[in-house]
Amino acid sequence: MKQKILITGGSGFIGSAITKHLVKDKCRVIVFDNNSRGKSRRLKEIKNKIKFIKGDIRNKKKLLSIKGKVDTVIHLAYVNGTKFFYKKPYEILDIAVNGLLNVLDLCRKKKVKNFYLASSSEVYQNPFKIPTDEEEMLKIPDVHNPRYSYGGGKIISELYGIHFGKKFLKKFIIFRPHNVYGKDMGNEHVIPEFINRFKKLRNKEKFLIYGTGKEVRSFIHIDDFVHGFDRIFKKGKNQEIYNIGTNEKITISKLAKLIAKVLGKNIKFKKTKVLKGSPSIRCPDIKKIKKLGFKHNISLKNGIKKILN
């Protein structure tokens, strides 16, 4: 019989994609999500094939009410979206710490064997190496800047998870997503935000870019991301950390031009000051996950077309 898997944050953008993939793989899945950022409609096509529990991971009683055996936990529940880093730093840290501790307590009580922790590229701040591998030093440049609540919470989660895993789990793995994009991801992220703003742009109106436009990112389509997660889920090694992304770099201004071209628009830019704490460049080293058989197939241009179609 296929293993029973609990996915926290399973109705979110990434969580729902992983949930659908595991259901297709004949796994028995429980989704635990309060739908504050997630959406039940993302799971509509498989709702009769999963068990959905609406709840907040900070509600320990609700979390521990999950019945029966759980073999594996995939922990994704968090608050994502850059604007929330600045607006809700306390809530982000509360979920990162108290929410995770509740999930780990459930693992201990149910004797869960395997745990996959979703971390983030936000743990890499001002990295020494580009592309950045998993051995890069993790740091918080400014504890007063609310932006780092997200990356700081992820670093705390990694520390808790690693040492809990050594004591209680058969397998503990961290995966660090890098700028995942795709249809229905929410408008708080750069690609859907740009698409929506382009559609509303009036003739001769300048397109606003935060920062210089020279900031560099590497994007991975959700379908390629799920393939990467699948490689980690099936072949990843205990106590290892894996980047999931591509090392194809693009500046934010070139990204805007690419989206405009796909939409058939001509644009002129208006640039403004960069948000404090926003990294100038982010690009993962993916040699480690490639050794598990990972290969990304969707170009950024084709990925944007998939969103629009």
Language model region names:
Residues M1-V180:
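N-terminal Rossmann-like NAD(P)+-binding domain of SDR-like oxidoreductases, especially those catalyzing
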Residues F85, L138-R147, K170-K183, I195-I220, ...:
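A conserved pocket-lining segment of Rossmann-fold NAD(P)-dependent short-chain dehydrogenase/reductase
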Residues N126-F128, K183-H189, K288:
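Short beta-loop-alpha junction of Rossmann-like oxidoreductase domains
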